[in-house]
Amino acid sequence: MVNFEVVKQYLFELGYEIQKEDAENEIVVITDKNIGINNLVIDCEEPIIILEQFILKLKDKNDAQVLSKLLKMNRTLVHGAFVLDEDGENVLFRDTLQLENLDLNELKGSIDSLVIAMNEYAGDFIGFMK
């Protein structure tokens, strides 16, 4: 529970408002639509922290061109990756970090990676949904 409280404090220091919290499962959700964060789920699962945000639903989960583009996008990300959910229908941003040594800058870097990716690839994501 200590690490969960530290993560919440870091989010506060970074200026994020916790939209939802499940203290029992050590999960928080933050949103800042002005910078591309929309229901970013932050889950403290000892020994790691998982950051995950829904990006889009694929029109065709077997579209090799879209899947190839997602892999190429991953190469440019500083932290995290675009991944598919269990059904292969939804694209998510996902990153994992070690909780034991987590510091403010590391958490900020992961969130910033999502923000940069959303800005850089917004046009591609819109194209994937057409």
Pin down the residues of each PLM region.
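Long, continuous compositionally biased terminal/linker segments
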Residues: 33-58
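Well-ordered alpha/beta subsegment
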Residues: 79, 83-109, 123-130
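Short, internal acidic amphipathic alpha-helical interface segments
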Residues: 50-89, 96
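Long, contiguous binding/interaction regions
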Residues: 116
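Extended Gly/Ser/Thr-rich low-complexity repeat segments
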Residues: 42-47, 106-112
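Charge-rich, low-complexity N-terminal segments
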Residues: 1-37, 76, 83-84
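Hydrophobic residues embedded in beta-strands of well-ordered beta-sheets
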Residues: 25-28, 47-49, 89-91
